[in-house]
């Protein structure tokens, strides 16, 4: 069984800022989903909330009466969240599946599924916690990623991902557990993270390919992530 680097403290050694640099664009995309689907949640929960920065960014741009509750099993992440918490935003060191009475209008599950040893069991445990679940995952599986020797192994070592998805396998995993897909869209993650000459060179062919066929671009060149709203 893989060692849980989030609990042992190994993860923060590799990612000391706990992905806070991704928080603004993630929060913006969450708001985009809410607007697209005419949702106005009053209580938002997040599984694997990390430092709580996504919730804080959401709070800054949403109804001031909205409440936010985050859960994480990593002590270091919750410690970092202390400066972001306030009267309407709380983060707990806890496994949400073991929290009595946990229920929300919207549950955020952002970059979590790929870390679950048994993600089907995890999906089943999320069903009763909220009528709406918003997922995000990086689409690591692409032809380009597979052809580059050691690419996926390196990502697993850095991010502790246990599973890698395409759009098709991710959506099918949700359907296998009786989730109803309400909305989904790609996000050009590579543009947000473009650094270094090789990554920047790939931006133009990705954009051209994506404009012609988004599914083909994601499968061939990668560099995209996926947001999915489900019931």
Label for each model-derived stretch:
Residues 136-161:
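Short, glycine-/aromatic-enriched active-site segment of Class I SAM-dependent methyltransferases
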Residues 100, 116-117, 174:
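Activation segment
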């Amino acid at each position: 069984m893989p060692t849980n680097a989030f609990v042992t403290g190994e993860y923060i050694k590799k990612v000391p800022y706990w992905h806070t640099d991704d928080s603004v664009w993630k929060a913006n995309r969450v708001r985009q989903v809410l607007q697209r689907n005419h949702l106005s949640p009053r209580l938002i929960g997040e599984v694997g909330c990390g430092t709580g920065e996504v919730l804080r960014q959401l709070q800054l741009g949403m109804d001031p009466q909205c409440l936010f509750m985050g859960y994480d099993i990593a002590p270091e992440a919750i410690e970092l969240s202390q400066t972001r918490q306030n009267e309407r935003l709380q983060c707990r060191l806890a496994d949400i599946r073991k929290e009595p009475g946990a229920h929300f209008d919207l549950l955020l599950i952002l970059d979590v599924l790929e870390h679950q040893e048994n993600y089907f069991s995890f999906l089943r445990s999320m069903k009763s916690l909220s009528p709406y679940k918003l997922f995000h995952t990086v689409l690591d599986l692409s032809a380009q990623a597979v052809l580059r020797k050691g690419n996926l192994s390196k990502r697993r070592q850095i991010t502790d991902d246990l599973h890698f998805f395409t759009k098709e396998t991710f959506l099918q995993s949700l359907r296998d557990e009786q989730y109803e897909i309400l909305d989904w869209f790609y996000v050009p993650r590579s543009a947000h993270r473009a650094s270094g000459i090789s990554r920047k060179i790939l931006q133009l062919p990705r954009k051209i390919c994506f404009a012609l066929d988004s599914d083909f671009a994601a499968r061939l060149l990668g560099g995209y992530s996926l947001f999915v709203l489900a019931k």
